[in-house]
Amino acid sequence: KLALGIGDDAAVWSTGPGLTVATTDTMVEGSHFFIDQIGWRNLGWKAISTNTSDVGAMGCRPTFALVTLGLRADLPVSGLVEMYAGMMDALEHSGGLIAGGDVVKSPVFFVTVALEGQSVTIGEKAHLLRRDKAKPGDLIAVTGPLGCSGGGLRLALGNDRPSDLKKEDSAHLNLAHFHPYPRVSEGIALARAGVKSAMDISDGLLDDLGKLCKESQVGAIIRASDVPADATLRSAFPDDWLALALGGGEDYELLFTAPAEIMDIAIRAMDGPISIVGEIHPAPTGVIVVDDSDSPISVATGGWDHFDHNSQSS
């Protein structure tokens, strides 16, 4: 419960039973977005949603956010007001409140959000979803289709834009990239179903599954034909849809693992589609993608690298 909000030297809130989680994410103009492409309201939505996705991926509900802005002198006040409206939209969708923040003058426009969340309590025990809890024999699953955000980024950057792409298909891919829907309620449902291992997909399925495997000291096999990609992505990028689904990044869907009996419970608890895409295996760590004959295949992907000058969001 928020006891003291914006206006004092610090925000004050009380925490209930369970565990408190915290995350932060920064979006920098020119590296993570271009304001003329994303728009002010979508910028606010996405700045919040990248954080609520992290909290939801741990099976927690968002509580309080702190927002820090680095502003150039030429930025319009009307744009900033619209950005905050987008933030409020995102918090209304996922839960949580803005408790405070800071504003600084900066030569580069940036938005930093720090977000706290509260764990699910089952009985008297807090239950978190974690990257280090995957076990050999677990099934690997994801929420929703993958790759549309990566397709939207390609369109925004003008890379290989299909000449015959329908207007509604372009809008669908752009929305996936600029206005992602974090799976907060789904993460909480997974925690209540008994799932222990999960993370969100922000850097691409292969890259993020590799991180989960490293933390859990296990390996994984993914079947390419089971990776979910919707008809729009397949139509727009018939030669690259699998690469985008495996490595496009910024999907903000959930990746999770569980034994078969828990997976059945989790699937029944979810409102949206769940796709089982593979299985966890004993170490060595790493991810192998196979075709329908179980032969390994190589897929070129473009997962996000914070220090790679060729990686760019928008």
Where are these regions (language model features)?
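A short, charged helix-loop
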Residues: 159, 164-181
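Internal active-site segments that recognize and position negatively charged phosphoryl groups
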Residues: 135-144, 178-205
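N-terminal glycine-rich phosphate/pyrophosphate-binding loops that anchor nucleotide-derived ligands
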Residues: 1-57
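Short pre-catalytic strand/loop immediately N-terminal to key active-site residues, enriched for Gly-Thr
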Residues: 38-42, 173-180, 196-197, 242-244
